């Protein structure tokens, strides 16, 4: 049920060549499974079992980390989601020194094509893999395109029902690039995921030798390798020689709430409205007619919305449709409105518009 409360409270040849360094020990090769190991997971590739190593489920969704281009120097014009999970793992044999690996292909698309159904499926699979009475896995790693990575990572953080570790990882350069960052990112992600020191920290994002909590982490640059950051809160750690080094003991935000989606079959439609000078949001009624169940205002400053837009939003709120006031700046706090006459907007607190959308869908 959507409730009107403050969210502050509710709340590839080149690839193979680049990673073909000799492993530290003899590495078991991937083998194709003829029969799925579990009816809950569509496992298509699995490493041979090594006693004493933890077990990691890699859910691949596509993205730049699985992308390919005709040129090894081209890191902008490429096809995302060209390489499957088996090739990703096989390109980094060092992975099998730190964990036994099962891989499943949830999707193989650019992250702009990730749907609510895919995200809901990943959440349910992660909970099945880690949070049951007899979990099959010790950790989950999700490979993902970077454009919407923070949305999926935050959704998992808000819906994972145990303190096991999920790491979401991507790359800023395709697998075929001469300086592809995917192999090292994947190795660091799996190594971080299976580390006991990672437990109790929520879902983590690992890229570019940095470890970031999903609740705070956001993409800050369209092209640079060091794009995922948490400006206000900072990183929680970074891999040193692939092994995670954390700056602080495990902790969770004081306002964090986890939502159980196990009985949810679909997420409601919530639209994000981008504010600007003289914004009207005239299309909200059409959105409602087409099934929108809520709106996020990506406002100016600390959630500012123009008076013309407020008129349209006041009308949809009068129909019981929730509206969250957030900020397109992506940093800072949108506080609850203390003026009752101003309307009943929900405060996004410190969540940016896309994370506010995911939380509103989960309430």
Describe the function of each predicted region.
Residues 1-27:
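Fungal secretory targeting signals
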